[in-house]
């Protein structure tokens, strides 16, 4: 007797409309722009600016924000290492579906562990654009938009990335954004750099 959940009894159902047809309809190529970096590095700011700039160009995108997905999809997960890994795995699987639908999926998460990000890259070998927000810890802590660094320094939050849990920077990211002469680029400038990459690689045409 078979049981539900037995992978030998689960089969992939093909769609009558394929990825190429969807991309042609949208006049763009589906991909995942994965924005990673410390809390306060500007990930969500870039994600919102990028999504808006794409919208003004008639391109369809969707943001998967690290905080937002914990309100629903990942509300059962905590912040232990294994939960963080599962958090990233789930977001990676959802992002893959968005890309297959022909959308430009913008994933904005700290995603501190290199192996977890690389696992997501492996899901999308031809459509994964890793954007590293390489901002100094001191700057992120100074911004502290959610007051989390202050809580972590006071010992009220354990396992906080950058304080008592490591952030592993990318080794092979497509785009690295950082300060220039001690000045942070504007959200529009950062979005423009990503859009230039997408244009050069052909993602903004079907």
Segments predicted by a language model, with ranges:
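The conserved Walker
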Residues: 39
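Conserved substrate/cofactor phosphate-moiety recognition/catalytic segment
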Residues: 48-93
């Amino acid at each position: 007797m078979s049981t539900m959940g037995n992978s030998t009894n689960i089969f992939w159902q093909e769609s009558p409309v394929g990825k190429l047809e969807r991309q042609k309809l949208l006049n763009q190529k589906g991909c995942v722009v994965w924005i990673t970096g410390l809390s306060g590095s500007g990930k969500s700011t870039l994600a919102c600016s990028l999504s808006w700039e794409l919208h003004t160009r008639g391109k369809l995108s969707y943001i998967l924000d690290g905080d937002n997905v914990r309100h629903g999809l990942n509300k059962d997960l905590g912040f232990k290492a294994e939960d963080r890994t599962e958090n990233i795995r789930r977001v990676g699987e959802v992002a893959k579906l968005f890309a297959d639908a022909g959308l430009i999926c913008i994933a904005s998460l700290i995603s501190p562990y290199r192996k977890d990000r690389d696992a997501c890259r492996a899901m999308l070998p031809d459509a994964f654009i890793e954007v590293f927000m390489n901002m100094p810890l001191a700057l992120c802590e100074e911004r502290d938009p959610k007051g989390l660094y202050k809580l972590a320094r006071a010992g009220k939050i354990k396992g906080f990335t950058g304080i008592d849990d490591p952030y592993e920077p990318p080794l092979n990211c497509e785009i690295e954004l950082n300060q220039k002469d001690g000045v942070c680029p504007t959200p529009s400038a950062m979005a423009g750099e990503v859009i230039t990459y997408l244009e050069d690689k052909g993602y903004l045409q079907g």
